[in-house]
Design a protein with these regions (language model features):
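Structured, solvent-exposed acidic/aromatic patches
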Residues: 1-32, 36-205
Length: 205
């Protein structure tokens, strides 16, 4: 289950990095956890988010509303952005938690993590715009007007890296096994509206 993945991996960084004098590690872990956490809400709705993030897995678990989880994640992102702006960690510091010999999202630049955090805020805002338009607009504007900004076309956008081309299971399924293809109904919709993403998202046989 999802609670066995990112929450377990990020727990120590979130809870112990500050006492070790490395709050920037906490900031990065909060951003990664936010990226995973908001998708849990989007996929499943209510979830025992606080229990999972504190590594509590045995019942009874306290399920929280999606809106409450979103608010927690917004707070986490605000904290992470604040920490990174205050600390402005060096590339050498990031080398302790990122393999900078391989191209990653930040490439050792703390500003890229801030941009990524702002992009998550924007995505969350768009997800909630029909439920709470006022808060959605506020969060979206907060992200795009931030002094560091958001990821643009000139920035790297791949937050993961793979030492082998087929190390990503989805890439292997789609490209080696040829098992993921565009459905005829979706293709028809894209063609009917002359949608430009048809040629951006999909390759021809």
């Amino acid at each position: 289950p999802m609670d066995n993945q990112i929450f377990t991996q990020s727990y120590n960084a979130i809870h112990h990095a500050t006492e070790l004098g490395k709050p920037e590690w906490r900031a990065v872990a909060l951003i990664i956890q936010a990226y995973q956490g908001h998708e849990i809400v989007d996929f499943y709705g209510a979830a025992p988010f606080s229990d999972w993030r504190n590594l509590k897995r045995t019942p009874p678990l306290t399920y929280e509303k999606g809106e409450d989880i979103y608010n927690l994640i917004f707070d986490d992102l605000d904290e992470a952005i604040r920490i990174l702006k205050e600390r402005q960690p060096s590339r050498e510091e990031f080398a302790k938690i990122e393999d900078l010999t391989i191209k990653t999202l930040s490439n050792g630049d703390w500003r890229m993590w801030v941009k990524f955090a702002n992009c998550i805020k924007m995505r969350m805002a768009m997800n909630m715009v029909k439920i709470n338009p006022g808060t959605a607009q506020s969060k979206f504007e907060q992200a795009v007007t931030d002094e560091i900004g958001v990821l643009t076309d000139t920035d790297a956008k791949d937050i993961a890296y793979y030492q082998e081309q087929n190390a990503c299971a989805l890439w292997r399924i789609g490209n080696e096994w040829h098992d993921i293809r565009l459905g005829a109904s979706f293709e028809n919709i894209l063609k009917r509206y002359n949608h430009p993403l048809l040629t951006r998202w999909f390759d021809t046989n």
